[in-house]
Amino acid sequence: TTMLVDIHGLLCSGTVKDIIGEDGAAAAYIGRIVPAKNGIVYKCEMSCIEKPAGSNTSFDIDLVSSAHSLAEDVVYDSGAGSLELSLIAAGGDWQVGMRKMSAVGLNWANLPADYIYLANGSGANSGGTYTAGKFIIKLYGANF
């Protein structure tokens, strides 16, 4: 499954692990894993094709999942049942041409039917709106 994500106009709070999304959106996910459509996901990758930009926004953006539908500006791993998974931790600012893969040994067992989100990876900003930023996200799954 390939997702093309444009973050222009989305909000980023100043809190690490907060969900990035539309202002006040009750459901800020960028996709949902459906085993009948995506298969059993076993790997993912994220590539930057336009560098994130915006005043007071984080360019360190993580790809995460949760069993819950979460709103923008909510911490994705609130500890509510430990049903969250950090799929890709950027570990720094995204640049055009960068590609990150999910970690080897990541436990995908809790992923079926999860919601996929972008989250603030650093918390080193005060919060703002993105004016640019595009990513290609690929989920690798099988169902046969």
Regions found by a protein language model. Give the residues of each.
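Surface-exposed, low-hydrophobicity beta-strand/loop segments enriched in small/polar/acidic residues
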Residues: 1-144
